[in-house]
Amino acid sequence: MIQIKNLKKEYRTNNTSNLVLDNINLEIKQGEIFGIIGHSGAGKSSLLRCLNLLEQPTDGSIFIADENITKKNSKQLREFRKKVAMIFQHFNLLSSRNVFENIALPLEIQGIPKSEIKKRVFELLDLVELPNKANAYPQELSGGQKQKVAIARALALNPLVLLSDEATSALDPTSTKQILALLKILNKELGLTIVLITHEIDVVRKICDRVAIIDKGRIAEMGKTLDVFLNPQAPVTRSFVETSIHTKVPDFIAKKLQDNPYSYDNTYPVVQLTFYGDKGKMPIIAEISRQFNATASIIQANIETIQDQIVGIAICHITGERQGWENALRFLSNQDVNLKVLGYATADNI
């Protein structure tokens, strides 16, 4: 659906230049919700605005639905932009127009007959669950309702792609939840491809199929959302993930860990076990005690939800005879769970 090849964006002022996007390559599949996350100034907004050429790339190419949009002239681009809609953090509704008129605006610009406009607007109001707000003005709406109107307006011309520029950043938690639920419905019911940029990792966690992490104008990491959350590779990714799910080892444990299990007598492994899906039903900790004459003491455990997938994360201290805990580690490494040895500690030090 969307291919970005060797994309660069540089801002030049007088004798200075600022490279905000450096050799970006990624592919977004049709019908997926793709998240782009990064800290302020990472380049994510510039990347999104390049996707509809609100920002002209300095170099590289962008293909949407097999069309190279970077090669289009102004007239061709105006026509193509009907296929790529956009919503914004601050809604951008016209205060002088009511809800009906705001949604109708792109249809009016296209010269659609009034009877068709009326039908389409009320279809969209039903779709975004605001059937009784046609005559209300933006100042009479909550933030979540304003964003729903903005979404309805964006969908007026039946786009292939919806670009979301920090669309939940100005909303309260309840409204954020409602907007994310609506985007998931639109994605499934309309087959709408959604490209979502945000600095909120929980937004990615809840609805994105895949995610790219941008840092200093480059893609630091990219993959399926569940994979990225459970096994983050780049430091910037780990910093985001640790604010969303409890994967970080508590400081009071970390400072007691040794790298070498044989540095001291009676030193045993501290491990992190991650279960998800049907894997959580396996009695692995009980099996350790039963098979290997070892004890797995749970230090910390929590349940998370990533993209409607239940994920369990447990930090355990495995104690017992050396052969027993070594066999237990081998057993765990062969099971269908994620195993990470965090370090080693004595039984009375955790």
UniProtKB/Swiss-Prot annotation:
Q: Which GO terms describe its cellular component?
A: plasma membrane
Major enzyme class: translocase
The keyword ATP-binding appears for this protein:
yes
Please report the record's description of how this protein sits within the membrane: Peripheral membrane protein
Spans through the membrane: none
EC no. given is: 7.4.2.11
Family recorded in the similarity comment: Belongs to the ABC transporter superfamily. Methionine importer (TC 3.A.1.24) family.
In Swiss-Prot or TrEMBL terms, this protein is called Methionine import ATP-binding protein MetN
Q: Can you name the source organism?
A: Francisella tularensis subsp. tularensis (strain FSC 198)
For this protein's source organism, the top of the classification is:
Bacteria, Pseudomonadati, Pseudomonadota, Gammaproteobacteria, Thiotrichales
